[in-house]
From Swiss-Prot:
Catalysed transformations (reactions): K(+)(in) + H(+)(out) = K(+)(out) + H(+)(in)
InterPro entries (UniProt xref): CemA
Superkingdom of origin: Eukaryota
Pfam families linked to this entry: CemA
Organism from which the protein derives: Fagus sylvatica
Topology in the lipid bilayer: Multi-pass membrane protein
Family (UniProt): Belongs to the CemA family.
Gene: cemA
One GO CC annotation: chloroplast inner membrane
Record key words, sorted: Antiport, Chloroplast, Hydrogen ion transport, Ion transport, Membrane, Plastid, Plastid inner membrane, Potassium, Potassium transport, Transmembrane, Transmembrane helix, Transport
Name of the protein: Potassium/proton antiporter CemA
Entry's transmembrane regions: 7-27, 114-134, 154-174, 189-209
Subcellular location: Plastid, Chloroplast inner membrane
GO term, biological process aspect, one: potassium ion transport
Length: 229
C-alpha cells in the first residue's frame, strides 16, 4: 500500500513532464487543417493589407529595384522585359504564400499553447494532493543537504541565470519561446527582455536571501557570501 502511494506522485510527475509534448503534438495535428481552411477562406483581405509588414516590405523593396532596372534596360528586346515582369509577378505571389503560411503558423501554435496552458492548469488543480506530496519530498531532500552544498547550488544557479555569460542563454531561451508561440523574431524585443530578466531575477534573489535565508539559516547566508566573494 505504501509503495502504491509513493508510485502515484511519481506517475503524476512523469505525466506533467510528457503531457505538454503530447498535447502540443495532438492539437497541432488536429487544428492544422481547420486553421488553414479558416484563414484561406476568410482572411484574404487582411492578408493583402498585412503584406506591408516590415518582414515582407524588404522583399518588395527588392522588387521595386527590379522595376527600376526594368526602366533602365528598355533597349532590351520585348521578350526579355516580358520574362522580367513574369518573374516579378511570380516572386510577388510567392511572398504572399510565404506570409500566408507564417500567419497560419502563428495562429496555430499560439492557439495550441493556450489550450496546453489551460489543460495543464486544470490538471495541476485536480492533482493538488500529488503536488503536495512532491513538494514535501523536495523539501525533505533540500533539508538533508549540508549548508555548503546548498550555497554551492544557489551560487551555480545564480551564475547560470544572472551571471556574466547568461544573456546568451536568455536570448536562446526567449527566442525558443517566441518560435514555439509562432511569433516572428524581433531583435529589439528580445534584446529588451534579455537585459531586463536577469536584473529582475537578481533583485528577487537578493530579497529572498535577505527575508528568508537570513531567518531560516544564517550560516547558509554566510557560506554563500563567502563563496560569492
Amino acid at each position: 500500500m505504501a509503495k502504491k502511494k509513493a508510485l502515484i506522485p511519481l506517475l503524476y510527475l512523469a505525466s506533467i513532464v510528457f503531457l505538454p509534448w503530447w498535447i502540443s503534438l495532438s492539437f497541432t495535428k488536429s487544428l492544422e487543417s481547420w486553421v488553414t481552411d479558416w484563414w484561406d477562406t476568410g482572411q484574404s483581405e487582411i492578408l493583402l493589407n498585412a503584406i506591408q509588414e516590415k518582414s515582407i516590405l524588404k522583399k518588395f523593396i527588392e522588387l521595386e529595384e527590379l522595376f527600376l532596372l526594368d526602366e533602365m534596360i528598355k533597349e532590351y528586346p520585348e521578350t526579355h522585359l516580358e520574362k522580367l515582369r513574369i518573374g516579378i509577378y511570380n516572386e510577388t505571389i510567392q511572398l504572399i504564400k510565404m506570409h500566408n503560411e507564417d500567419c497560419i503558423y502563428t495562429i496555430l501554435h499560439f492557439s495550441t499553447n493556450i489550450i496546453c496552458f489551460v489543460i495543464l492548469s486544470s490538471y495541476s488543480i485536480l492533482g493538488n494532493e500529488e503536488l503536495v506530496i512532491l513538494n514535501s519530498w523536495v523539501q525533505e531532500f533540500l533539508y538533508n543537504l549540508s549548508d555548503t552544498i546548498k550555497a554551492f547550488s544557489i551560487l551555480l544557479l545564480t551564475d547560470l541565470c544572472i551571471g556574466f555569460h547568461s544573456p546568451h542563454g536568455w536570448e536562446l531561451m526567449i527566442g525558443s519561446v517566441y518560435k514555439d508561440f509562432g511569433f516572428a523574431h524581433y531583435e529589439q524585443i528580445i534584446s529588451g527582455l534579455v537585459s531586463t530578466f536577469p536584473v529582475i531575477l537578481d533583485t528577487i534573489l537578493k530579497y529572498w536571501i535577505f527575508r528568508y535565508l537570513n531567518r531560516v539559516s544564517p550560516s547558509l547566508v554566510v557560506i554563500y557570501h563567502s563563496m560569492n566573494d
